[in-house]
Design a protein with these regions (language model features):
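Short, basic/aromatic recognition patches
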Residues: 12-36
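Globin-like tetrapyrrole-binding proteins
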Residues: 1-19, 88-173
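N-proximal short alpha-helices
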Residues: 23, 39-43, 86-89
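Short, low-complexity, polar/charged sequence segments that are solvent-exposed and flexible
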Residues: 51, 62-64, 72-76, 120
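A short, conserved beta-strand element enriched in hydrophobic/aromatic residues
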Residues: 28-65
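Short, solvent-exposed cationic patches
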Residues: 66-89
Length: 173
């Protein structure tokens, strides 16, 4: 799994950078962190589908265990979005067992990531957050049901539907 971090996340956490080509990588994600109400809001977005994971109250020492945290959040968010375990099993079976990091170079994806952060921030400010968990499944499900448009609004889709189409491609092979 490869995560391209925004400058804010790189400054906050300072992970080891490893350049990698992720143009059509099913395991490529973008991540951004912002402070909200004295706590960190971490949003991780899948590059190909814009599928979003939301974490609130993340501490710096928890970022050292980011791989299991993201894997569990992926599983929970996918099942909460209506995926069956049979549909998502191949994705996790083929998933790399570690995370590499680099700085984001795609301004379009960073802009979409910022929009996902806005949506998550809005929902958490309106509906609140789960205090017993840093993973905010309700915010992830909300972000994954909103339409994302590309190509000057000629192509619009829900991130969960796009992620499902990639899972179907993965399941066919």
């Amino acid at each position: 799994m490869h995560i391209q971090c925004t400058k804010a996340l790189l400054t906050y956490w300072n992970p080891k950078i490893e350049e990698k080509n992720t143009d059509h990588d099913m395991y490529a994600w973008h991540a951004h962190i912002v402070k909200r109400s004295r706590k960190n809001l971490l949003v991780v977005m899948h590059d190909l589908s814009r599928f979003t994971l939301v974490f609130y109250g993340v501490k710096k020492n928890q970022l050292k265990e980011l791989f299991p945290m993201i894997t569990i959040a992926q599983m929970n968010s996918l099942t909460a979005s209506g995926f069956t375990l049979d549909e998502i099993k191949p994705y996790f079976d083929m998933q790399p067992n570690h995370i590499t990091f680099s700085q984001s170079k795609n301004r379009t994806l960073v802009a979409r990531l910022n929009k996902a952060v806005e949506y998550a921030d809005f929902l958490l400010s309106q509906d609140g957050y789960y205090e017993d968990s840093i993973e905010q499944i309700h915010a992830s499900v909300f972000c994954n049901q909103l339409l994302v448009c590309e190509n000057n609004y000629k192509v619009c889709y829900e991130p969960k539907d796009k992620f499902k189409s990639y899972l179907d491609l993965l399941n066919d092979h």
